[in-house]
Amino acid sequence: MNQVRKWNIIGGRVIKTGIAVFLTVLVCEFFNIPTIFAVITAIVTIEPTATDSIKKGLVRFPASTIGSAYAMTFTFFLGHQALSYALAAMFTIVTCQKLKLHAGTLVATLTAVAMIPITADHYFTAFLIRLATTSTGIIVSTLVNFFILPPHYVKTISGCTEELFVKTAHIMEEWLNALIEGKVITKETTHNLSKVNLLLHKAVQFVQYEQKDWKYHRHTKKEMRSFLLVQKQLHLLQQIIYHIDNLARTPIETCDWSQNEKEILRRTIHSIISILRNNCNKIDEEHFKLIDELDKQFWNYKNDLAHCKPNQYHHHFSSESIILFEVLSIHDMLEELKQIXEKYEGENQFNCSVH
Protein backbone atom coordinates (compact mmCIF):
# COMPACT_ATOMS: atom_id res chain seq x y z
CA MET A 1 0.00 0.00 0.00
CA ASN A 2 1.43 3.33 -1.02
CA GLN A 3 1.17 6.00 1.61
CA VAL A 4 1.61 9.69 1.07
CA ARG A 5 4.04 11.04 3.63
CA LYS A 6 4.19 14.66 4.63
CA TRP A 7 7.63 15.87 5.50
CA ASN A 8 7.89 18.91 7.77
CA ILE A 9 11.05 20.78 6.83
CA ILE A 10 10.83 23.00 9.92
CA GLY A 11 9.21 21.51 13.01
CA GLY A 12 7.95 23.25 16.13
CA ARG A 13 11.08 22.42 18.11
CA VAL A 14 13.33 23.99 15.44
CA ILE A 15 11.22 27.17 15.42
CA LYS A 16 11.32 27.35 19.23
CA THR A 17 15.09 26.91 19.21
CA GLY A 18 15.42 29.86 16.81
CA ILE A 19 13.12 32.02 18.95
CA ALA A 20 14.98 31.06 22.13
CA VAL A 21 18.35 31.95 20.59
CA PHE A 22 17.00 35.27 19.28
CA LEU A 23 15.51 36.30 22.63
CA THR A 24 18.58 35.13 24.54
CA VAL A 25 20.86 37.34 22.43
CA LEU A 26 18.53 40.33 22.95
CA VAL A 27 18.56 39.84 26.73
CA CYS A 28 22.36 39.45 26.82
CA GLU A 29 22.86 42.58 24.71
CA PHE A 30 20.48 44.52 26.96
CA PHE A 31 22.51 43.60 30.07
CA ASN A 32 25.80 43.87 28.15
CA ILE A 33 26.98 40.33 28.93
CA PRO A 34 28.61 37.78 26.54
CA THR A 35 26.15 35.90 24.36
CA ILE A 36 27.94 32.72 23.30
CA PHE A 37 27.50 30.70 26.51
CA ALA A 38 23.90 31.83 26.91
CA VAL A 39 23.14 30.78 23.32
CA ILE A 40 24.76 27.35 23.76
CA THR A 41 22.71 26.77 26.91
CA ALA A 42 19.52 28.01 25.22
CA ILE A 43 19.96 25.59 22.31
CA VAL A 44 20.43 22.47 24.45
CA THR A 45 17.68 23.44 26.92
CA ILE A 46 14.89 23.13 24.33
CA GLU A 47 13.42 19.69 25.07
CA PRO A 48 10.51 17.67 23.62
CA THR A 49 8.40 18.64 26.65
CA ALA A 50 8.14 21.68 28.91
CA THR A 51 8.53 19.36 31.91
CA ASP A 52 11.90 18.14 30.67
CA SER A 53 13.03 21.73 30.03
CA ILE A 54 12.28 22.67 33.64
CA LYS A 55 13.76 19.53 35.20
CA LYS A 56 16.91 19.48 33.06
CA GLY A 57 17.30 23.25 33.40
CA LEU A 58 17.50 22.81 37.18
CA VAL A 59 20.24 20.24 36.59
CA ARG A 60 22.18 22.20 33.96
CA PHE A 61 22.57 25.32 36.08
CA PRO A 62 24.59 23.72 38.92
CA ALA A 63 26.46 21.59 36.36
CA SER A 64 27.51 24.71 34.44
CA THR A 65 28.51 26.33 37.72
CA ILE A 66 30.82 23.38 38.40
CA GLY A 67 32.33 23.59 34.90
CA SER A 68 32.94 27.33 35.23
CA ALA A 69 34.54 26.91 38.65
CA TYR A 70 36.95 24.24 37.42
CA ALA A 71 37.83 26.29 34.32
CA MET A 72 38.73 29.37 36.35
CA THR A 73 40.60 27.36 38.98
CA PHE A 74 42.87 25.53 36.54
CA THR A 75 43.38 28.65 34.41
CA PHE A 76 44.43 30.59 37.51
CA PHE A 77 47.04 28.00 38.50
CA LEU A 78 48.19 26.65 35.11
CA GLY A 79 47.32 29.38 32.63
CA HIS A 80 46.14 28.66 29.08
CA GLN A 81 47.92 25.31 28.86
CA ALA A 82 46.69 22.09 27.27
CA LEU A 83 46.68 20.55 30.74
CA SER A 84 44.16 23.18 31.90
CA TYR A 85 41.69 22.12 29.21
CA ALA A 86 42.15 18.43 29.97
CA LEU A 87 41.84 18.76 33.74
CA ALA A 88 38.84 21.12 33.52
CA ALA A 89 37.01 18.70 31.22
CA MET A 90 37.89 15.60 33.25
CA PHE A 91 37.04 17.06 36.65
CA THR A 92 33.78 18.54 35.33
CA ILE A 93 32.64 15.20 33.88
CA VAL A 94 33.58 13.20 36.99
CA THR A 95 31.94 15.68 39.38
CA CYS A 96 28.71 15.86 37.35
CA GLN A 97 28.52 12.07 37.21
CA LYS A 98 29.18 11.71 40.93
CA LEU A 99 26.49 14.28 41.74
CA LYS A 100 24.14 12.63 39.20
CA LEU A 101 23.88 15.79 37.12
CA HIS A 102 23.87 13.69 33.95
CA ALA A 103 21.66 16.03 31.90
CA GLY A 104 24.07 18.90 32.49
CA THR A 105 27.38 17.12 31.84
CA LEU A 106 27.69 18.12 28.17
CA VAL A 107 26.84 21.80 28.71
CA ALA A 108 29.09 22.00 31.76
CA THR A 109 32.05 20.48 29.90
CA LEU A 110 31.57 22.78 26.90
CA THR A 111 31.35 25.76 29.24
CA ALA A 112 34.52 24.72 31.06
CA VAL A 113 36.74 24.33 27.98
CA ALA A 114 35.26 27.35 26.18
CA MET A 115 35.90 29.69 29.11
CA ILE A 116 39.65 29.03 29.33
CA PRO A 117 40.88 30.81 26.16
CA ILE A 118 38.74 33.92 26.67
CA THR A 119 39.64 34.57 30.32
CA ALA A 120 42.96 36.26 31.09
CA ASP A 121 42.26 37.86 34.46
CA HIS A 122 39.46 38.80 36.88
CA TYR A 123 38.63 35.13 37.26
CA PHE A 124 35.93 35.51 39.89
CA THR A 125 34.15 38.19 37.85
CA ALA A 126 34.31 35.94 34.78
CA PHE A 127 32.84 33.13 36.88
CA LEU A 128 29.88 35.29 37.97
CA ILE A 129 29.27 36.50 34.41
CA ARG A 130 29.21 32.89 33.24
CA LEU A 131 26.54 32.07 35.83
CA ALA A 132 24.49 35.00 34.56
CA THR A 133 24.74 33.94 30.91
CA THR A 134 23.94 30.30 31.72
CA SER A 135 20.92 31.36 33.78
CA THR A 136 19.72 33.57 30.93
CA GLY A 137 19.87 30.73 28.40
CA ILE A 138 18.06 28.29 30.70
CA ILE A 139 15.31 30.71 31.73
CA VAL A 140 14.61 32.01 28.21
CA SER A 141 14.52 28.52 26.66
CA THR A 142 12.27 27.14 29.40
CA LEU A 143 9.79 30.02 29.01
CA VAL A 144 9.81 29.66 25.21
CA ASN A 145 9.22 25.91 25.45
CA PHE A 146 6.40 26.45 27.93
CA PHE A 147 4.47 29.29 26.29
CA ILE A 148 5.36 29.28 22.57
CA LEU A 149 4.07 26.35 20.50
CA PRO A 150 3.66 24.08 23.56
CA PRO A 151 4.12 20.43 22.54
CA HIS A 152 0.91 18.52 21.71
CA TYR A 153 1.40 14.94 20.61
CA VAL A 154 -2.18 13.59 20.43
CA LYS A 155 -2.45 14.03 16.63
CA THR A 156 1.01 12.54 16.14
CA ILE A 157 0.10 9.56 18.34
CA SER A 158 -3.17 9.07 16.42
CA GLY A 159 -1.24 9.11 13.14
CA CYS A 160 1.23 6.53 14.46
CA THR A 161 -1.65 4.35 15.67
CA GLU A 162 -3.38 4.39 12.28
CA GLU A 163 -0.08 3.56 10.58
CA LEU A 164 0.43 0.68 13.01
CA PHE A 165 -2.98 -0.78 12.12
CA VAL A 166 -2.09 -0.72 8.40
CA LYS A 167 1.44 -2.07 8.78
CA THR A 168 0.38 -4.78 11.23
CA ALA A 169 -2.24 -5.97 8.74
CA HIS A 170 0.40 -5.99 5.99
CA ILE A 171 2.75 -8.16 8.05
CA MET A 172 -0.09 -10.57 8.83
CA GLU A 173 -0.71 -10.82 5.09
CA GLU A 174 2.97 -11.55 4.40
CA TRP A 175 3.01 -14.21 7.12
CA LEU A 176 -0.15 -15.82 5.71
CA ASN A 177 1.44 -16.08 2.26
CA ALA A 178 4.43 -17.86 3.81
CA LEU A 179 2.09 -20.20 5.71
CA ILE A 180 0.13 -21.12 2.57
CA GLU A 181 3.35 -21.83 0.68
CA GLY A 182 4.80 -23.75 3.64
CA LYS A 183 8.00 -21.70 3.60
CA VAL A 184 9.93 -19.71 6.17
CA ILE A 185 9.11 -16.01 6.32
CA THR A 186 11.27 -13.76 4.16
CA LYS A 187 13.94 -11.36 5.42
CA GLU A 188 11.75 -8.54 4.13
CA THR A 189 8.92 -9.59 6.46
CA THR A 190 11.34 -9.77 9.40
CA HIS A 191 12.64 -6.30 8.48
CA ASN A 192 9.07 -4.93 8.26
CA LEU A 193 8.30 -6.38 11.68
CA SER A 194 11.36 -4.61 13.11
CA LYS A 195 10.16 -1.32 11.59
CA VAL A 196 6.72 -1.80 13.14
CA ASN A 197 8.34 -2.34 16.54
CA LEU A 198 10.33 0.88 16.08
CA LEU A 199 7.15 2.77 15.14
CA LEU A 200 5.42 1.35 18.21
CA HIS A 201 8.32 2.44 20.43
CA LYS A 202 8.13 5.93 18.90
CA ALA A 203 4.37 6.15 19.54
CA VAL A 204 4.78 5.00 23.16
CA GLN A 205 7.48 7.65 23.62
CA PHE A 206 5.09 10.34 22.33
CA VAL A 207 2.48 9.12 24.85
CA GLN A 208 5.02 9.59 27.63
CA TYR A 209 5.82 13.10 26.37
CA GLU A 210 2.13 14.01 26.34
CA GLN A 211 1.61 12.66 29.86
CA LYS A 212 4.53 14.71 31.21
CA ASP A 213 3.02 18.01 30.00
CA TRP A 214 -0.60 17.06 30.70
CA LYS A 215 -0.72 19.03 33.98
CA TYR A 216 0.65 22.23 32.44
CA HIS A 217 -1.91 22.76 29.67
CA ARG A 218 -5.69 22.85 29.51
CA HIS A 219 -7.49 20.11 27.60
CA THR A 220 -11.12 19.65 26.63
CA LYS A 221 -12.95 16.48 27.63
CA LYS A 222 -12.95 15.41 24.00
CA GLU A 223 -9.15 15.76 23.79
CA MET A 224 -8.75 13.78 27.00
CA ARG A 225 -11.01 10.97 25.72
CA SER A 226 -9.16 10.95 22.41
CA PHE A 227 -5.82 10.64 24.19
CA LEU A 228 -7.05 7.83 26.44
CA LEU A 229 -8.43 6.02 23.38
CA VAL A 230 -5.16 6.04 21.44
CA GLN A 231 -3.27 5.14 24.62
CA LYS A 232 -5.40 2.01 25.09
CA GLN A 233 -5.22 1.21 21.38
CA LEU A 234 -1.42 1.37 21.50
CA HIS A 235 -1.33 -0.94 24.51
CA LEU A 236 -3.42 -3.55 22.69
CA LEU A 237 -1.53 -3.11 19.42
CA GLN A 238 1.65 -3.72 21.38
CA GLN A 239 0.24 -7.09 22.48
CA ILE A 240 -0.89 -7.92 18.93
CA ILE A 241 2.60 -7.17 17.59
CA TYR A 242 4.04 -9.37 20.34
CA HIS A 243 1.85 -12.28 19.19
CA ILE A 244 2.77 -11.65 15.54
CA ASP A 245 6.43 -11.71 16.55
CA ASN A 246 5.80 -15.13 18.11
CA LEU A 247 4.13 -16.29 14.88
CA ALA A 248 7.16 -15.13 12.90
CA ARG A 249 9.43 -17.22 15.14
CA THR A 250 7.33 -20.38 14.90
CA PRO A 251 8.58 -22.88 12.26
CA ILE A 252 5.76 -23.13 9.73
CA GLU A 253 7.55 -25.37 7.24
CA THR A 254 7.06 -28.36 9.61
CA CYS A 255 3.30 -27.85 10.00
CA ASP A 256 1.06 -30.65 8.80
CA TRP A 257 -2.38 -29.15 8.23
CA SER A 258 -5.31 -30.87 6.60
CA GLN A 259 -6.80 -29.01 3.66
CA ASN A 260 -9.84 -28.03 5.72
CA GLU A 261 -7.73 -26.80 8.65
CA LYS A 262 -5.53 -24.70 6.40
CA GLU A 263 -8.57 -23.19 4.69
CA ILE A 264 -10.21 -22.21 8.00
CA LEU A 265 -6.93 -20.67 9.19
CA ARG A 266 -6.50 -18.80 5.92
CA ARG A 267 -10.03 -17.36 6.05
CA THR A 268 -9.62 -16.39 9.72
CA ILE A 269 -6.37 -14.53 9.10
CA HIS A 270 -7.87 -12.79 6.06
CA SER A 271 -10.70 -11.68 8.33
CA ILE A 272 -8.19 -10.42 10.94
CA ILE A 273 -6.37 -8.46 8.23
CA SER A 274 -9.63 -6.80 7.14
CA ILE A 275 -10.50 -5.92 10.74
CA LEU A 276 -7.08 -4.35 11.32
CA ARG A 277 -7.34 -2.30 8.14
CA ASN A 278 -10.71 -1.07 9.39
CA ASN A 279 -9.10 0.01 12.72
CA CYS A 280 -11.14 -2.68 14.51
CA ASN A 281 -14.35 -0.67 14.14
CA LYS A 282 -16.36 -3.67 12.98
CA ILE A 283 -16.22 -7.46 13.49
CA ASP A 284 -18.89 -9.44 11.63
CA GLU A 285 -20.58 -12.69 12.67
CA GLU A 286 -18.71 -14.72 10.06
CA HIS A 287 -15.46 -13.89 11.82
CA PHE A 288 -16.76 -15.20 15.15
CA LYS A 289 -17.82 -18.46 13.47
CA LEU A 290 -14.31 -18.87 12.08
CA ILE A 291 -12.85 -18.23 15.53
CA ASP A 292 -15.09 -20.95 17.01
CA GLU A 293 -13.78 -23.40 14.40
CA LEU A 294 -10.21 -22.37 15.13
CA ASP A 295 -10.79 -22.79 18.85
CA LYS A 296 -11.95 -26.38 18.30
CA GLN A 297 -8.86 -27.06 16.20
CA PHE A 298 -6.62 -25.73 18.96
CA TRP A 299 -8.09 -28.01 21.63
CA ASN A 300 -7.96 -31.00 19.27
CA TYR A 301 -4.24 -30.47 18.71
CA LYS A 302 -3.65 -29.97 22.45
CA ASN A 303 -5.58 -33.12 23.36
CA ASP A 304 -3.72 -35.16 20.75
CA LEU A 305 -0.42 -34.12 22.32
CA ALA A 306 -1.73 -34.86 25.82
CA HIS A 307 -2.44 -38.49 24.88
CA CYS A 308 0.90 -38.88 23.15
CA LYS A 309 3.48 -40.76 25.28
CA PRO A 310 6.77 -40.64 23.39
CA ASN A 311 9.91 -42.39 24.61
CA GLN A 312 11.99 -39.22 24.35
CA TYR A 313 11.63 -35.54 25.16
CA HIS A 314 8.89 -33.72 23.24
CA HIS A 315 7.51 -30.19 23.11
CA HIS A 316 4.22 -29.70 24.93
CA PHE A 317 2.97 -27.53 22.06
CA SER A 318 3.28 -28.39 18.40
CA SER A 319 3.89 -25.68 15.79
CA GLU A 320 0.24 -25.99 14.78
CA SER A 321 -1.07 -25.46 18.32
CA ILE A 322 1.29 -22.49 18.86
CA ILE A 323 0.07 -20.83 15.66
CA LEU A 324 -3.57 -21.40 16.60
CA PHE A 325 -2.98 -20.05 20.11
CA GLU A 326 -1.32 -16.88 18.79
CA VAL A 327 -4.07 -16.26 16.22
CA LEU A 328 -6.76 -16.74 18.89
CA SER A 329 -4.88 -14.36 21.19
CA ILE A 330 -4.77 -11.74 18.42
CA HIS A 331 -8.54 -12.14 18.04
CA ASP A 332 -8.99 -11.43 21.77
CA MET A 333 -7.07 -8.18 21.35
CA LEU A 334 -9.22 -7.24 18.34
CA GLU A 335 -12.37 -7.70 20.40
CA GLU A 336 -10.99 -5.41 23.10
CA LEU A 337 -10.05 -2.80 20.50
CA LYS A 338 -13.59 -2.92 19.10
CA GLN A 339 -15.13 -2.49 22.56
CA ILE A 340 -12.88 0.50 23.28
CA UNK A 341 -13.84 2.15 19.97
CA GLU A 342 -17.56 1.56 20.62
CA LYS A 343 -17.27 3.02 24.12
CA TYR A 344 -15.49 6.10 22.76
CA GLU A 345 -18.11 6.61 20.04
CA GLY A 346 -20.91 6.16 22.57
CA GLU A 347 -19.45 8.81 24.89
CA ASN A 348 -19.05 11.23 21.98
CA GLN A 349 -22.68 10.75 20.88
CA PHE A 350 -23.89 11.19 24.47
CA ASN A 351 -21.96 14.45 24.89
CA CYS A 352 -23.23 15.75 21.54
CA SER A 353 -26.84 15.04 22.55
CA VAL A 354 -26.34 16.77 25.93
CA HIS A 355 -24.92 19.91 24.32
Curated annotation (Swiss-Prot):
Does the record's keyword annotation contain Thylakoid?
A: no
Membrane topology label: Multi-pass membrane protein
| Keywords annotated in UniProt | Cell membrane, Membrane, Transmembrane, Transmembrane helix
Task: Spell out the subcellular localization from the entry.
Answer: Cell membrane
Q: Give the main location.
A: membrane
Give the UniProt entry's GO cellular component terms.
Answer: plasma membrane
Q: Which domain of life is it from?
A: Bacteria
Q: Where are the transmembrane segments?
A: 19-39, 74-94, 109-129, 131-151
The text of the family note is: Belongs to the UPF0421 family.
- What is this protein's name? UPF0421 protein BCE_2776
Organism name: Bacillus cereus (strain ATCC 10987 / NRS 248)
Lineage, top ranks: Bacteria, Bacillati, Bacillota, Bacilli, Bacillales
